[in-house]
Design a protein with these regions (language model features):
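Histidine-centered metal-chelating micro-motifs
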Residues: 72-73, 92, 108, 112-118
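Ligand-binding loop in jelly-roll beta-barrel domains
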Residues: 112-138
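Short histidine-centered beta-strand/loop micro-motifs
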Residues: 51-52, 72-78, 95, 119-121, ...
Length: 147
């Protein structure tokens, strides 16, 4: 049995940042997200709370996305896992074998090295939270070339 003050193993696995924490470190408030430009055919709002831009974390990123009806982005083969929780509407995740419609209250995991393309085809668009491990960056998303 681990000692009472041991950190959970999942926390240590997320990245070196967490394993370096000491007991005298206090919580860090993220006062507001950074707005990041989104890829796609229509404007989409990306609010990064934790990640390379807003908090200088490379181990993971957490962002809230708001995309309009009819938004779609180029396909990608990322070097990260993306864990997505849909808060409102429906997010369609296209993959080589078809697509998955992820609705409010559901989640989906897109795996590193697998091709995916996201879109929000239904009325009202979608609002969702994406967690990427390691953190999202333009250099590790590997978007499809424009045709």
């Amino acid at each position: 049995m681990p000692p009472a003050n041991a950190r959970p193993t999942w926390l240590l696995a997320v990245g070196d940042h967490f394993s370096r924490l000491s007991e005298d470190v206090m919580p860090t408030l993220i006062g507001s997200p950074a707005r990041i430009e989104a890829a796609g055919n229509k404007p989409k709002i990306i609010e990064e709370f934790i990640g390379r831009v807003n908090s200088r974390h490379e181990a993971l990123s957490i962002a809230k996305m708001t995309s309009p009806q009819g938004w779609e982005e180029p396909g990608q083969t990322p070097d990260f896992e993306e864990f997505t929780i849909v808060l409102k509407g429906m997010l369609r995740v296209n993959y080589r074998g078809g697509h998955i419609d992820v609705r409010a209250g559901q989640a989906v995991i897109s795996h590193s090295g697998e091709w995916v393309r996201y879109e929000t085809p239904e009325e009202g668009g979608a609002e969702y939270v994406a967690i990427c491990v390691p953190a999202f960056a333009p250099f590790n998303v590997h978007r499809d070339e424009a045709e």
